[in-house]
Amino acid sequence: MTQPFIAVIPARLASTRLPNKPLADLGGKPMVVRVAERAREAGAQQVLVASDAQSVLDAARDHGFEAVLTRADHPSGTDRLAEVAATLGWSDDTVVVNVQGDEPLIDPVLVRDVASHLAAHPACAIATAAHPIHDAADVFNPNVVKVALDAQSVALYFSRAPIPWSRDAYQPHWPDVAAMPAPAFPVYRHIGLYAYRARFLRTYPTLAQAPIEQAEQLEQLRALWHGERIAVLITESAPEAGIDTPADLARVQALFQPSSK
């Protein structure tokens, strides 16, 4: 049986690398609408766009999606979702999935599976996903977030650094990253997709920001710092990359162009 869930898409215009990103045109529709369509395909009972920009809310509503105005001072997408959860008064056990607003190619099946993964792990406050890394360049890329897991695939830590560090494999080559071998042991890349229970979302803003969260700029570390558990669904295939730069946008825009005949 498919786990019922609500999908919320946090979207802000103030992107430093790609201004007005949520409204970027993808085949005649704004990016945030393309993401909302993916969430709807995943089977969400309700799809909401959460933003501090009226233009984003208008774009969502113009295409038939619900939209909620939020404050502009949220430090993370999870904080923005927490405001929505408090405003709409969802029951404690409602499963809420945070679908990143710059992921118009996100697999709807993965969205649905992460929601179900949370339901299957009642001791965990959050569920997310990861996939194996096979390229040494990704291991050492700080823009690729890694996650270390315990025996039950519950997160031990998330980092932009290469974790776990293979002393015998990496130390002889350090600091020549180009000479590093491909990992011969499991290294997992975190996929920025989260499922929460509404009860936890309402608690999240009351938790003080953690030093490790601020250092790594990874919002999920606040939950770990305060003793919460994060269940990680392992998927063998890497998801399509999100949109962070003008080059990323051009690549994805090409995919939404009608095929020429």
From Swiss-Prot:
Pathway: Nucleotide-sugar biosynthesis; CMP-3-deoxy-D-manno-octulosonate biosynthesis; CMP-3-deoxy-D-manno-octulosonate from 3-deoxy-D-manno-octulosonate and CTP: step 1/1; Bacterial outer membrane biogenesis; lipopolysaccharide biosynthesis. Keywords: Cytoplasm, Lipopolysaccharide biosynthesis, Nucleotidyltransferase, Transferase. Belongs to the KdsB family. It is an enzyme of class 2 (transferase). It comes from Burkholderia lata (strain ATCC 17760 / DSM 23089 / LMG 22485 / NCIMB 9086 / R18194 / 383). Gene3D superfamilies: Spore Coat Polysaccharide Biosynthesis Protein SpsA, Chain A. CDD domains: CMP-KDO-Synthetase. Its EC number is 2.7.7.38. GO terms for molecular function: 3-deoxy-manno-octulosonate cytidylyltransferase activity. GO terms for cellular component: cytosol. Activates KDO (a required 8-carbon sugar) for incorporation into bacterial lipopolysaccharide in Gram-negative bacteria. Its main location: cytoplasm. It catalyses: 3-deoxy-alpha-D-manno-oct-2-ulosonate + CTP = CMP-3-deoxy-beta-D-manno-octulosonate + diphosphate. InterPro entries: Cytidylyl_trans, KdsB, Nucleotide-diphossugar_trans. It is found in: Cytoplasm. This is 3-deoxy-manno-octulosonate cytidylyltransferase 1. It holds the Pfam family CTP_transf_3. One of its GO terms (biological process) is lipopolysaccharide biosynthetic process.
